[in-house]
């Protein structure tokens, strides 16, 4: 269990992020078309998981926009993962014109538990904590960041550097 804060108030996650150097947990997420997004699709490629509570909050929306801009320049593969319904993610990305990130919903799978990012208590219980996981082309975790305060943005530069972007 990891501890983070929401506006200074301590809350917990259900576990810990996977360790750097360990095999990344397999995942199955849902895309905006309700199709399956599987970790198998990215074998042999590096991928950045931008994990957050909801696209309908300002900091989360900023992270999607920022990674969209940065991914365009680098050609990086970025999945934006939240518990939002795929319809909400698709609406947001359509309205924002994002084209370089892939929205991926964890609304019906064990992603949050497998990656240790489901919030266990407090007003956001059940949603995902703000975190970054970079999975290398070898399938191992290359970088992680559990953002200590949900209202803060992740370290974009460190995440993209770990991705090699």
Curated annotation (Swiss-Prot):
Keywords: Antioxidant, Disulfide bond, Oxidoreductase, Peroxidase, Redox-active center. It catalyses: a hydroperoxide + [thioredoxin]-dithiol = an alcohol + [thioredoxin]-disulfide + H2O. Its EC number is 1.11.1.24. InterPro entries: Redoxin, Thioredoxin-like_sf, Thioredoxin_domain, TPX, Tpx_CS, Tpx_Peroxidase_subfamily. GO terms for molecular function: disulfide oxidoreductase activity; peroxidase activity; peroxiredoxin activity; thioredoxin peroxidase activity. Belongs to the peroxiredoxin family. Tpx subfamily. Thiol-specific peroxidase that catalyzes the reduction of hydrogen peroxide and organic hydroperoxides to water and alcohols, respectively. Plays a role in cell protection against oxidative stress by detoxifying peroxides. Homodimer. This is Thiol peroxidase. It comes from Mycobacterium tuberculosis (strain ATCC 25618 / H37Rv). The lineage of its organism: Bacteria, Bacillati, Actinomycetota, Actinomycetes, Mycobacteriales. The gene is tpx.
């Amino acid at each position: 269990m990891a501890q983070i804060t929401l506006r200074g108030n301590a809350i917990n996650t259900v576990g810990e992020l996977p360790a750097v150097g360990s095999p990344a947990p397999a995942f199955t997420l849902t895309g905006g078309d309700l199709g399956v997004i599987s970790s198998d699709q990215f074998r042999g490629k590096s991928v950045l998981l931008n994990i957050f509570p909801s696209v309908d909050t300002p900091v989360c929306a900023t992270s999607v926009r920022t990674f969209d801009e940065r991914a365009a320049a680098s050609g990086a593969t970025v999945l934006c993962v939240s518990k939002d319904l795929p319809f909400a993610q698709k609406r947001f990305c359509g309205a924002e014109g994002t084209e370089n990130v892939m929205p991926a919903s964890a609304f019906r799978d064990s992603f949050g538990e497998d990656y240790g990012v489901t919030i266990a208590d407090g007003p956001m219980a059940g949603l995902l904590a703000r975190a970054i996981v970079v999975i290398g082309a070898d399938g191992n975790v290359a970088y992680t960041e559990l953002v200590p305060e949900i209202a803060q943005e992740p370290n974009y530069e460190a995440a993209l550097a770990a991705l090699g972007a």
